[in-house]
Amino acid sequence: MHGLLLAGLLALPMNVLAHPAEQHASNVLSRRGVDIESFRLPLKAKYMDSDATAQKIQAMSFSKDDDYVSTATKLVKSTFPKSTFRVVDDHYIGTNGIGHVHFKQTAHGLDIDNSDFNVNIGRDGKVFSFGNSFFTGEIPKENPMVKRAFSDPVKALKGAVKALNLPVKSDNAKAKTAAGKESFEFMGTTGALSAPKANLVYLQKEDGSLALTWKVETDVGDNWLLTYVDAHNSETVHNVVDYVASAEYKVFAWGLNDPTEGNPTSIRDPWTDASPYTWNSDGMTKYPTTRGNNAIAQDNPTGGSTYINNYRPQSPNLIFSYPWSPTATPPSSYKDFSITQLFYTTNRYHDLLYSFGFNEAAGNFQVNNGNKGGKGNDFAIVNAQDGSGTNNANFATPPDGSPGRMRMYNWTTARPNRDGCLEAGIVIHEYTHGLSNRLCGGPANSACLNALESGGMGEGWGDFYATAIRLKPRDTKDTNYSMGAWAANNPKGIRAYLYSTNLQTNPYMYTSVNSLREVHQIGTVWASMLYDLMWALIEAHGGTYSADPVFRNGVPQDGRHLTMKLVMDGMALQPCNPNFVQARDAILDADRALTNSANKCTIWKAFAKRGLGYGAKYDARNRTGSNKLPPGC
């Protein structure tokens, strides 16, 4: 077997991408005169942590012979005995031994699309924790399927196109029946990357009522949208979900942060056991190019939607070694190096996340899942030097079974222009959107981080992982990090504050979110808390700066990797569209599941430092902070 020789910036994926708020992905709609922020889903979720759950289930009767799905189903039935619901086909058991089961509430056989229930089952077969956003109001008595007094799906498509000013021509659209109840695919349209779709669903509104809507799906590249169009008035759009997460990154790369920190180095056979087919095969075909089971990387100078026939470097002997110079211009002159770097960073991050539990059953990005669960045929499509934009990057996360798509842009902030692919932090931040969207709410639901606060946490997780991965042996808790400084050509980076444990350097507190209205700003607050948490756990368990964690009984043995594991496990525990308080509780529950709460007080102290302590409360307009610790800490 020939070894894979990659010439790339070596360093643990380091930096995150920073992006000015004015240029995040949804601003593509803003440039069309539409403010997508005003269409975000309302936060409806509740979360019962493991302590509260233990008290609640004492009064419930569960059979020891039940499997974890049956136990979860009984809990939902006992909690909402008058509700109808279905089991979502994406349940799995995580590497921490917790089973995750997801449910969707229904009414008259139709989904209530933002009414979810997630149940987490412990190793002992008992309910560990759960969350839900089920509708508790009165279900409409009349079945809409009887009189069918709702609009045609084509009208809904046209309503979405008009309301959001989408570049989709729908004059000749015709609806063709698709799989699923009241589901359709539209023929005769142009402008979308794939045929638009629609299905009839109910939607919980902000005022607590239900609306019958057409959920219209349109992938227009920079935005991949689910638009909830009123089924009785196609001119009314209630809410919008965008699968694309964007960021104006200014970042860094794996051991190295950016080209200022070192030179390209050749690495042989860098894959881990997470990639049993290597990076250049999917177990069926061996590819002499930057394509494999986890990712397919190519250039995309036109910014188009196709990728299979786009240019990739070819190497029959799998030696991908190409020249690069910091003075080279334009970036297209080193596209082979750029594509190779993007392919390397994406695969390396895939393998790291796999070790933490983002595997096939959890909904990761792979073509061939090897009968290990989940849905395959969904590697990450990663475009280098994408011509659809500049000074930015984005990642679209459809549900498990459909490929994720990353677009990496060139940056015009310096002369010569800079290529975002050379900053691993940008790539890591974007790929983390795929991680969090697949875990939160389950692999089959990619709409669980689309409220303002949960969307902010989506940005914060990207910043956190990019920063955690870039730590160096010389770093201490007094080390500060900026985001996106190299790509932005600005040493201060692109966030409001540096990531720092010093409250004078970074004064963000939980209550700061009360005055913030943009997801990247809110994300900076969340990532600041996670940065504090990481250093608290490093002080408790020591730090290691190896590329991969060392596990003992499933627990990373150093504080840095332990934080990454707990934060990731928390994503799978928390409810759909969580708030800060619920996400904090989910991390505490993740520690209970993994270490029997060995780090409980350390975690509480880290969050309390910035006001997310015991007694902190969520309110969309008036969050209450607390620096207190719970009894026993």
From Swiss-Prot:
Record keyword RNA-binding present: no
Root EC class: hydrolase
Transmembrane segments: none
Subcellular locations according to the entry: Secreted
Keywords: Glycoprotein, Hydrolase, Metal-binding, Metalloprotease, Protease, Secreted, Signal, Virulence, Zinc, Zymogen
EC number: 3.4.24.-
InterPro entries for the chain: FTP_domain, Fungal_virulence_M36, Peptidase_M36, Peptidase_M4/M1_CTD_sf
Disulfide bonds: none
Glycosylation sites: 410, 480, 622
A single MF term (Gene Ontology): metalloendopeptidase activity
GO cellular component, one term: extracellular region
Pro-peptide positions on chain: 19-246
PANTHER family: EXTRACELLULAR METALLOPROTEINASE MEP
Protein name per the record: Probable extracellular metalloproteinase 3
Species: Arthroderma benhamiae (strain ATCC MYA-4681 / CBS 112371)
Gene: MEP3
